[in-house]
């Protein structure tokens, strides 16, 4: 059984990220570590602006079972991060929907924090 408070937190965060164009309808993944051996992640058919308990599943970090078939396609990546970075509690993977269009008219992508105060680096765009 999934913790309802955790589902609410992830659903609210998912809606915010969806509204800011970090998640598309079916693009992205969001998860939280439940304990040392398990984590909760969205299902592969989750709609990020309408998440509820049915939009998530609980997975074992070390062992794949039938639940991995309905989980997000990024589940392996999340499991690896949780297994190797023990302090990790939440992971969100998103790709802004206009990134590809942006690359058509620009030579680089500048990575900034949410408030735009810190620059994390640049990615050159090659044709």
Predicted feature descriptions by range:
Residues 1-127:
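Glycine-rich flexible loops
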């Amino acid at each position: 059984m999934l913790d309802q408070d955790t589902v609410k937190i992830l659903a609210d965060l998912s809606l915010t990220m969806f509204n800011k164009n970090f998640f598309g309808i079916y693009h992205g993944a969001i998860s939280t570590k439940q304990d040392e051996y398990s984590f909760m992640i969205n299902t592969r058919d989750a709609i990020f602006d309408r998440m509820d308990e049915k939009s998530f599943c609980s997975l074992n970090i070390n062992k794949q079972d039938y639940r991995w078939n309905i989980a997000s396609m990024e589940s392996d990546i999340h499991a690896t991060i949780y297994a190797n970075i023990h302090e990790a509690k939440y992971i969100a993977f998103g790709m802004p929907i206009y990134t590809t269009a942006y690359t058509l008219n620009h030579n680089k992508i500048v990575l900034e924090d949410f408030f735009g105060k810190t620059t994390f680096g640049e990615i050159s765009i090659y044709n």
